[in-house]
């Protein structure tokens, strides 16, 4: 993924805020390293926005990528319900729980247990949470969700005191904590108190425009750290949650004078040095039937003949139809596909939003590692 732009005059290393990387594609770029280490982050959003999944991604990646055990404490869904929710994703939470590197705690908040009393406190919760943390040496904690935890308290004074005490207790345990909360009309949580004492606030949004769902993520607040300030698209697929830091992309890639053949010798002669410039973007424009696909096929064939892998994204034809049509003008694309030099991916553009198509492209680039990419046709995306 891309790197966030560097800031001038960074703070001395000893003074910089330590961070816990999430391992989520793109997210660590816009937060410049992840979530604040040893502090509390509030994840806010509406129903179905991805709050719980972001927390689970944070825990699972923490174990797999950074060897940091974690605790997931749910005040809503049971352990089996969470496992079922993750069944369609490549996130094997159950295996990590069995290995005792993630501790799952389902806290059932009976109304009789949470009553409005002058001496109400969270000592019972602290004891249970401390036992879970200490039993596996957890470095990361997720509480899902804070509305359910404090649902039985209506006294504002008690509520404010207990929320502050919870956040202070988590910091004292020196764990990196994530707390989820439902976004309300004029605040990031139902109570509107957590946002003031959270060190970091992440807002998730899921909106529908022109019958296409689009997910957005934004860093609202991050004490002691620079961060991307824009809204960034993100998607949820079988790999979990992935962020596309489009507006954080830096223009720092190197230039080159190297040329590559168009696949048509007479066309190469029209370019100074012969052919397209390596690393450049070439737009082939024209009305229907003017040969746009043929020019793209010529370039694809030439790239494969040089032994360079090529990725062909088709939004109009299936792989079989493309191969058949191009064989009529002597381009044997099937040969290159069988040799593993050419990967053709066809998708109907109306099935997904632009963000999903872009993320798919990111992942295909990482998988195929092509030297050449052909997109046919960008106008229908």
Language-model features: where?
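Conserved inter-motif catalytic segment of the P-loop NTP-binding fold
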Residues: 66-151, 308-381
């Amino acid at each position: 993924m891309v790197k966030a732009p560097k800031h001038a005059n960074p703070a001395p290393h000893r003074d910089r805020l330590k961070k816990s990387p999430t391992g989520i594609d793109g997210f660590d770029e816009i937060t410049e390293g992840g979530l604040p280490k040893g502090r509390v982050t509030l994840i806010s959003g509406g129903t179905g926005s991805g709050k719980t999944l972001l927390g689970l991604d944070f825990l699972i990646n923490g174990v797999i990528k950074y060897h940091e055990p974690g605790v997931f404490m749910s005040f809503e869904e049971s352990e089996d319900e969470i496992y079922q929710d993750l069944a369609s994703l490549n996130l094997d939470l159950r295996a990590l729980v069995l290995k005792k590197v993630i501790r799952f705690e389902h806290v059932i908040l009976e109304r009789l247990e949470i009553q409005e009393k002058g001496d109400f406190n969270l000592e019972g919760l602290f004891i249970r949470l401390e036992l879970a943390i200490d039993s596996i040496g957890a470095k990361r904690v997720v509480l899902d969700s804070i509305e359910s935890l404090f649902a039985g308290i209506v006294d504002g004074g008690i509520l404010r005191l207990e929320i502050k005490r919870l956040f202070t207790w988590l910091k004292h345990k020196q764990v990196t904590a994530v707390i989820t909360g439902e976004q309300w009309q004029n605040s990031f949580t139902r109570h509107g108190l957590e946002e003031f004492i959270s060190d970091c606030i992440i807002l998730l949004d899921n909106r529908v425009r022109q019958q296409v769902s689009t997910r957005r993520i934004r860093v609202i607040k991050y004490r002691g750290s620079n961060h991307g300030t824009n809204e960034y698209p993100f998607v949820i697929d079988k790999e979990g949650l992935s962020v596309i830091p489009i507006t954080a992309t830096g223009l720092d890639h190197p230039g080159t004078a190297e040329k590559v053949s168009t696949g048509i010798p007479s066309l190469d002669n029209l370019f100074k040095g012969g052919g397209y410039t390596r690393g450049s973007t070439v737009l082939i424009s024209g009305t229907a039937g003017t040969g746009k696909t043929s020019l793209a096929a010529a370039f694809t064939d030439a790239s494969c003949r040089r032994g360079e892998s090529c990725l062909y994204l088709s939004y109009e034809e299936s792989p079989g139809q493309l191969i058949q049509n191009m064989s009529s003008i002597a381009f044997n694309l099937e040969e290159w596909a069988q040799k593993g030099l050419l990967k053709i991916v066809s998708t109907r553009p109306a099935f997904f939003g632009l963000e999903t198509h872009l993320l798919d492209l990111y992942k295909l680039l990482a998988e195929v590692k092509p030297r050449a990419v052909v997109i046919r046709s960008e106008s229908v995306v």
